[in-house]
Structure formats: structure tokens, C-alpha cells
Curated annotation (Swiss-Prot):
This is Receptor tyrosine-protein kinase erbB-3. The modification Phosphoserine is found at S686, S982. Residues 1175-1187 have a biased composition (Low complexity). One of its GO terms (molecular function) is transmembrane receptor protein tyrosine kinase activity. The cytoplasmic part of the receptor may interact with the SH2 or SH3 domains of many signal-transducing proteins. It comes from Pongo abelii (Sumatran orangutan). It is an enzyme of class 2 (transferase). ATP binds at residues 715-723, 742, 788-790, 834-839.
Amino acid sequence: MRANDALQVLGLLFSLARGSEVGNSQAVCPGTLNGLSVTGDAENQYQTLYKLYERCEVVMGNLEIVLTGHNADLSFLQWIREVTGYVLVAMNEFSTLPLPNLRVVRGTQVYDGKFAIFVMLNYNTNSSHALRQLRLTQLTEILSGGVYIEKNDKLCHMDTIDWRDIVRDRDAEIVVKDNGKSCPPCHEVCKGRCWGSGPEDCQTLTKTICAPQCNGHCFGPNPNQCCHDECAGGCSGPQDTDCFACRHFNDSGACVPRCPQPLVYNKLTFQLEPNPHTKYQYGGVCVASCPHNFVVDQTSCVRACPPDKMEVDKNGLKMCEPCGGLCPKACEGTGSGSRFQTVDSSNIDGFVNCTKILGNLDFLITGLNGDPWHKIPALDPEKLNVFQTVREITGYLNIQSWPPHMHNFSVFSNLTTIGGRSLYNRGFSLLIMKNLNVTSLGFRSLKEISAGRIYISANRQLCYHHSLNWTKVLRGPTEERLDIKHNRPRRDCVAEGKVCDPLCSSGGCWGPGPGQCLSCRNYSRGGVCVTHCNFLNGEPREFAHEAECFSCHPECQPMEGTATCNGSGSDTCAQCAHFRDGPHCVSSCPHGVLGAKGPIYKYPDVQNECRPCHENCTQGCKGPELQDCLGQTLVLIGKTHLTMALTVIAGLVVIFMMLGGTFLYWRGRRIQNKRAMRRYLERGESIEPLDPSEKANKVLARIFKETELKKLKVLGSGVFGTVHKGVWIPEGESIKIPVCIKVIEDKSGRQSFQAVTDHMLAIGSLDHAHIVRLLGLCPGSSLQLVTQYLPLGSLLDHVRQHRGALGPQLLLNWGVQIAKGMYYLEEHGMVHRNLAARNVLLKSPSQVQVADFGVADLLPPDDKQLLYSEAKTPIKWMALESIHFGKYTHQSDVWSYGVTVWELMTFGAEPYAGLRLAEVPDLLEKGERLAQPQICTIDVYMVMVKCWMIDENIRPTFKELANEFTRMARDPPRYLVIKRESGPGIAPGPEPHGLTNKKLEEVELEPELDLDLDLEAEEDNLATTTLGSALSLPVGTLNRPRGSQSLLSPSSGYMPMNQGNLGESCQESTVSGSNEQCPRPVSLYPMPRGCLASESSEGHVTHSEAELQEKVSMCRSRSRSRSPRPRGDSAYHSQRHSLLTPVTPLSPPGLEEEDVNGYVMPDTHLKGTPSSREGTLSSVGLSSVLGTEEEDEDEEYEYMNRRRRHSPPHPPRPSSLEELGYEYMDVGSDLSASLGSTQSCPLHPVPIMPNAGTTPDEDYEYMNRQRGGGGPGGDYAAMGACPASEQGYEEMRAFQGPGHQAPHVHYARLKTLRSLEATDSAFDNPDYWHSRLFPKANAQRT
């Protein structure tokens, strides 16, 4: 580092030697564009940074600091005040980035397409070296782009910065995450906003503290402390010279919107003239001259001219000027010294857009006809047109072969010069020979052959060359330079009329017509000879200069009988077409044209002459006086103060009357529209039956005409069609009703929707509070289904946007309402097929409705085929039988319902995120299911798991799901645990209220439809107190650690459910007395003895607030018959019994548990108990929990036979509510001991709080739970299986194979299946759903 110190000292001395240059102007340095790519090691990278940015103030480009070591001294960066591009800091090891003076990052270039500041991976995994602090204390403006700061293990105080005060673009993305954790707090004077822990590290706020009158930054909170509009990054005063940085350009310390222009308006000459004080834009600075390696393009300094301009030198200034056509392009020719000997198909494309040929052009027979020896194909004659752009050939032109159908060389019609710097053979610069079909030369623009001889011979059809005066073309002596022979004789050409046009002069011509003349006899216009110009008539009017016709200026008025102009300028017109400004004809008078002292404004008088406005007019005028100024208040002269006051009062009265009348008219129209909307939305139509014997159905839907519907915009698209937002304009009405229009098309084209089918009428007859009612349908080539427009959108978007404002009460009620809506569809025989959170809409924040039901049945069967390649196919929501066999039933909808509830409980997470659609069925076959959401207890999660059972017959029905979620919704904190995270300085408060009634009214307004859907309370007769109370229920939340969260995979969205080892280790730790929480995976199979864990968990969901006594579920294998199992078998009834167990109402009589929209209220009795508020189990009497022997005999359980046993003694009352908590079901531990046990163990109930008011009809929790040990326990009890010696269940013996059966065991329905083979697949045939292969051939049914 001594060498580095020496270099820094030398650099400092050099900077001091520059003296005033550094002090009086900004030190500008170039940036880099390397990204994360670097050359050399860290030492080389440091030296490069030092050379680029030492004493630099403005970085013209990007500031990239990558792979710099921990001992690098970066103090030389402290002078940087502005970066025009982006700032990249990545993979460094230094502790502090010293940019204390950086104020503005302009973001003219952004990293990764969207970030102006990108800071990432600044740490060393093998040491403690890492970036710990960004010293950007003066940064107050990012003009374009966002911020990305991630994965910096030691970087602190990034989340204490108000980035919205710095970033100008409100839509810019700001990502700040995964940085330092153990950081000191901000100093108290910083008020929570700082770059570091010291008092000098406070963030400077320049936007959020400003008064509303300020458009941008400010230097104080008062209205008179706003910064100038051209300021960026703050200011110290209101002037444009007080800015810390400029928004656009800095002109000698003043911030201006543009630099002084190169042309200004001269009021004396009425012309734009060069500005002696012009400056050019160089980055964000106005400079008097561009750097030597830049060129001037209009008002800017650029590195190179754009494609349509060329670089020229004017008075020592390099400038870009328009090319006036093709820009000059030089191309290499053919012949000696070149890579090519002739023009052929291999090099013809290299002459595109060439204006100058450096060398020669040879056209030989091997080029046109091809060269088989070199495998060069024949040349396409049409490609010879590329030479239309050639103006000069520096060498010679040699044409010895030409396409037979081309009779001239008009492809060289723009050729003006043949240089002759290199000559062919005996000194020829133009050689044309043996072209048998050529009749004329066609070199109409050729003016000069600088050197060399001309050889034209053996062209049997060539004429017109006899007339040429070659002395006008050849430069220098002409003696012995012409060798023209053996062409067509002159007399033959004259005899056939192949002579020059009469308009040609005596100089001759290159071919027929007035456009081939070497010179004209009279006038020429655009290279064509004419008899006269359009002096007095014709369009456009012209003047002549050196016998060539030119058009007058467009602003000249065409004259009759006299000349319109005498030159090309606007000051040469005899009369102006529009206005005259001084001597010049203009299209309009100057309006805001920049002059030497500011903008110039003029107005036209009666003669259309432009006259200057009054000097105080700033926005134009219509006359010369002050009162003629535009945008200014007229001064009333001669009016008394009394008259003025009366006029003002009268005007105010008229205005108020007009406003009052307008309001009353608007209110009347509003009420009228509201009533009309209700009439149309609530009224149905009766469809007459086709068969007179049938009874007419009340169909709520209408049959629309296409003229009544108007689509406004596309809301989205799905598997079966596209959804539009639109309006319904009833025929004969003027109201516009907002609706959703779903367009369904048959992609195969085999079906049209001209006829109204029974299924369409069935959909239209459905009406329920929790389904979106079909307003009508419009048949045609594509079917249009019309529903009411719900502006709150889908439930999926709502939970994602308001996840911090959703409580357990609302989530569980949504589950109830979706289940009720689906149960209504089930009662009416309607299978949804596409149930998901995106297809559930919000009518209000407390009421949801199921949408898009019955759509799939409108399409032909082939259109319902599922393709994994289709991204819109809802594979992740579909049941396995639907994926594999296309089987859709109400029970397949139950599977989708479970996924939908999972979406709600994860606040809109994507199921199976990161998996391709084709991988999902294989994953489900292996027994994997979606992971338990963090907010769900095992009760809620097991309801989801039951919805995902492979056998559709043992899934719950929607009626049972509605009852189950209704029961949970009466005590929400018991089943959902939502943690409220508090930010810095924010205390945790009660559950947010969501959208207020006022916001709901604003959401329902449709300004583009001129429609207001809200009326006063006496018009609506709808109370809004229900919604308010539902959203403002004070629900307690639990902040408890969850021991099972280590198994969740947030990246993938599902939980692996076959981790048997975890369960075994958990059991071992439980037996050994450890209270440490173990993860408990949920696996459907494989499990011991061929039993599915999902089967063993059927019916084992906690069903009431008083469930305390646990039942250990014994899993067993069940062989099924080949036919589908009826819904009335024992297992099914046992499951239904557990789900339909009535809940004893605890609320006082007379209190409603649901509102008019089906919103379930929390049980007031439960909410009155402390345990309920804390989310623990309800306190009940012990006798109520244990029950009596008679009650035990009447209870029926699934997959187990329970013996009667005596009630254990009363447990002690817990000392505090902290001893109570949620418990997870242990389904991952080894069950082999319990399955083979013949003894019983007493079940130890969790300590409870007695409550004499609880009824004894309570369900049970199916959990394996042990009494806590003496050590400190966690919030969740460790639930391991009971030892084999203590199981309280009957002996369950394994089924032996043939010849090994126990004599006393008989099974009437037992059918032995074949053993499992390696080639078997779970879905080889549809019979899989009604049978199962056991791992062992001698497995016994239990």
C-alpha cells in the first residue's frame, strides 16, 4: 500500500497544480458500463477506480464499484456530487462507501432495466469483512429508476431510509431486504430516519415535509419555502441559483430548463440568427464548447452523429448536418489490388447504399453467369440496382458483360464522376465492349471523366453516342482519348428515329427522351429538359436560376399574370399566403419564440402584418394595448367600488343558484338511475317451455341483444374465455349499468351458441347470496355471459393487497360463504370445475360470491381436454381424478375448495410454486400435499387435508364444510393465529378495519359511465352497520412460536409428507422427556403397514370449543371393492358424524349469530372468557369433557374400537393462560408399537379451566398428547405417541396371508389383492380409485 499512498500524494499534487481549473469548474469524468465483469485482481480494480474518479465531481455515466478489497482507501470518491447513470456496488469487502457529497443520481441509464442504485452481496463468507454502512447522507434525489439493496449481511440502516422521499418516480420499484439484522438504532435526533447511528447520519427529507403548495422539494415546511421548479435534490432558497442540483441543466450556477439556443430571433431583421452566447448540453451542464472528442448535434454534445447526418467542419467546429439523402458511404471496388476480380453474386450485397467506389468496377461474364469453378452462382440482374446510389468511381468502369434484357446502363444514372486514378489495360477509364443488346449508354448524370481513355466497341445495337460532345465530359487534353468503333452506324440509328430529343442542346444525349440530354436547349427541371418554367401559371410557381427551374417558397401566394417570387427565400415573395413578419412570409406570427432578452410575442393586424405585443404581455395578445394581453384580467376603468361590489355579489348569487339547480338535477337523475338499475338487476323473466306439458321456470337471466352490451376494456382471460368490463344499456333507456361480460368461444369452430340451451337457463335460474348471479346471456357465434360488475375484484387480489388488514374472523367467514355458495350449486346439480380464489369475487369486504360456475359445460367435450402446456389450465387446483380421467363431480370441487382455502390462509400464495404443471400429478400421487399455512392450527389444516383425499367418497361435502367453518368462525382466535408485526416506532394495535363504508362508496362509483350507485340511507334502506361491526371486531392475536414451521418450504409452496425419520426422532425425544419442539410432517403414504396417514386422520378434526380429551387414531389398511364405495358405508357415516356433531350454542337467546349476508359473528360467551381471547381452548368442566360410560357407548368412531375406561382424576387448574396453546397432530411418528399393543395407556388431558356452564355434548380432539414434564415447556406441547404398554385400544392384529389366518377372525368383504410390483403405477388404470395394493401380500385388514 505504500505505492498506493505515493500515487495518491502525486495525484493530489497534480490536482493542486491545476488550481483554478478544478476550483472554477466541475471536474467531469467518464463512467463505465462493465456491470459485474472486471479485469484483473482487486488491486488492479482499485487502481482503475482511482484513475477514473480521483477528484471527480460529476460522473458522466455509471459509477460501478465491484470486487474491491477490504483494505482499499476509497476516500477519493468523496468529491462526487452527481452521477448521470446508475450506481452499482457489488461483491466488495470494504466497510464504508464514502460518498458523503453525492446528491443526485439521474438514472439516464439504469441497471437491470429498472434500478438506479444496485447494492448486493457485499460481504466475504470466509471472513468478517463486509460493507457495513453507505455514507450517502446528502443523497436526496433519484430522477429515474428504483433502488435494489439485498443480501448484504452486515449492511445496516437501509430499512430506516424513506426511499420515497428520494425516488422521484412513484412507480419505481424499491427492494430493500435481507441485509444486516443486529444494527444499532438511529440517534434520537434523527426521528427514525438515518444512514447510520450517529447524530450526523440523519436523512435529509426534502419532499415529505413540504407544504402542499410546493411542487417538488423545499427547504422548510412553510408555503414560502418551496424550491425552484428546476431544482433537484433540495435547495437553500427559492431562487434557481439556490439549488443543490439541477433537474435539467446547470448554466453557470443557475438551473435552467434548456441551455442558451444557437439561434435567437432578431427583432430588427425578423430572422433567427446565430446566438453569440450559445452553449451546448454536455450531460447536465451547459458548456461553451464541446470536448475535443465530441461533435455538435444541434444543441448537444454527442460522441457520434446519428445515421441520417454526417460530420462536417464549419469554422473549426465539428458539427452534424443532414445528409440530404443518403449519407456518404465509401465501398471497396473490384479488379487489381482488390479481393474480387468482378462483380458477382458473392459480393453484390456489399455495394448497398454505396455512394463512392474506392477503386474500380468490373462486370465480366464469369460474374453475371456464375463461376462453377469457384462455386459462385449466377447474378440476379435485379440486384444491379444497388448501383443507383453510386455517384463517384475513383478508378475505372469496365463493362464487358450485361444482362440481355437490360438495354442501357441506367443503374448508373446518378454517376457523376469517373476519377481514372487506376486505368484498365492500355489506360482506359471507361470501357464498354461486346454488349450485344445495349441500345443506349444511359449515363444521364455523368459530368466528368477526370483521366484515362474511353473505349466503346463491338456494341452492335448502341446508338446516341454519335451525338455526344465528349469535350464537355473529359477533363484535360482530349486528343487520342476516344476509341469508339464497331457500334451501330449513325444512319441506321437515324433511320429508326433513335436520335436526341428536340429539347436537348447541341451537346448531344445519352439516350432517348428529354431526361437523357447532356444539356438543355431551354430550361431544366430536376434533370429533365422543359420548354419553360411555371412563372405565371402551373403548380408550383417557379423562378429560374441558370436555366434551371426552382419552386417558390411555400408561404408565397400564387399570383396570376405576374411572377410569384424572384428567389427561393421567404423574403422574395410578391405576396404572402398567410402573414408577413417584416419582409418574410410566415405561417403564423411569432408566439414565444426565444429572443435575445426573452420570448417574443406578436399579433397579426388587419393587413396580416405581424405587430409586437405590449411588453408586459407574457402569454400572447390580440392587440397592441395592455388590455389586449391573453391570460390577464382586464382593468375596469371608471367603475365605482359600489358598482364593482354589487356586480360581484350578483355574480355570486347567480353562481350559487346555478350550482343549486345543477345539484338538484344531478340528485334527481342519480335517484332515477339507481331505481332503474335496481329494477333491471332484480327483475327476472319467465321463459315459456317448448313442451306445453312442462311448467314454466322462473329464469332470472335475460336474453340480451348485442346492441344492448358495450365492452370497455379487458379485465382478464382464462381457460374458457375472456372477461370484459362493460355496460348494459337497456333498450329504450338512457342508463348505463356496469356489468362484466364473459365471452365464451368454441376454439374448434364446431359449435355456435345461437340457441338457448337448458343448461344456459339452469345457470340463469340460480340465485344465492354467495354466488354471482347471471344477469343474462347473449347468444351468437360466441356466447356472452353477463353478470353484475363487482369493483372490489377477486378475492385473490384482495388478500394479497390487504394481508396486513385481514383478521381470523374475516378469513373464516369467507370460508363459510364459499362453502355455502358451492353447497347451493351442489343442490342444483351444478359442478363448478374451476373453483379458485381468483374466481371468487367480493361484493363487499365481508361478503364474497363464487363466480364462473357452469361455464365448462357450455363447451363441447373436446374443448375440455387438459393440456399441461396450457399455462391457464388450473392443474394445481384440480383433483387427481379430474387431471387423469377428466372426471368432474361435486367432490372434485371439494378438492378445489381445499386449495382455495389454502390460498386464503397463505394470503394469496401460489400453490406448488416453482413446479411445472406436468409435475403436479406425480407429486400428488406420491402423497405430497400443500404445506400447513403459518396462521392455521391443526384443526383448520386437517379440514384441508380431508378435502385432498384421493378417494373422492371420503371427502367432506360442502354442507359439512359450511357447518365446520361456521363453528370455527364463532371462536376465530382459537383456529387462526395471525401475528401482527410492528415496525420501528409503531406499536401493535387492534385488528385493522379494512375498507371503510366511505371507501366502499367511492369504489362503487364509475365516473367513466357517469353513474353513481350510492344513495342516501332513506333511498337504499340498507344498513351499513353490519359491515362496520364485522370489520371492527376486536380479535386478540397470538404471538407464539410455531415449532413446525421449519418444515415449511416457502419457495415451493408445498410440504413433503413422507419424512418418517423426523417423526421417529421426535418420538424419541418425547419419550426421553425432552420438551423441545419437533417438526411434524404430514404424509399420506408410504406409512407403516400400508396405511395412509390421511386415512388415519379422517374425522379427527377438533369440532368444538370444549374438545379436550384426545383420541389416538389407529391407522389401518382397507381393501376396497372394484366398484365405487357407496356414500353410506360405515367409514363415511363415521366421518359425517364427526363433522356434523352439533355445537351447543353458548350465546344468550335472542342474539343473532349471522347477519343478513351470512356473516358469522364470534360467540359472545366465548369472547367473554379470557381463554378465548387468548386463542386457547375454552374452559369447560372436567366432567363435561370426560363424559359418562353410557355416553361413550353411544359414540361411534372411525377405524377404531374404543373400550370403556374410568375417568382419570381432575387435572390441576393452570396457573396462567400461558400454559394453554395450540397443539399439532402427530401423524409422522412411528405407529408400529401402538398397532401391535395389547395394553392400554391412560390419556392425559391438557390442564383446563373448569366451567360449569359448558354442556357435556362436546367432540374430542384427535391428538396424541402427553402431560408436560417438569422442565420449561414451549407454547406448544410435544405430542408423541403413547408407549405401547399404555395404549388404551383393542388389540389390532396384522392380517396374515393364506394359511396363516387367525381362526377367530372373519371378514365378509375381504378380497386379497396381488402384491406390489416395481412396475406398478398408482394411475395405471381407473380401478385405482377403488382398490389399493398392499406392500405385503400377507397384510391383514384391521
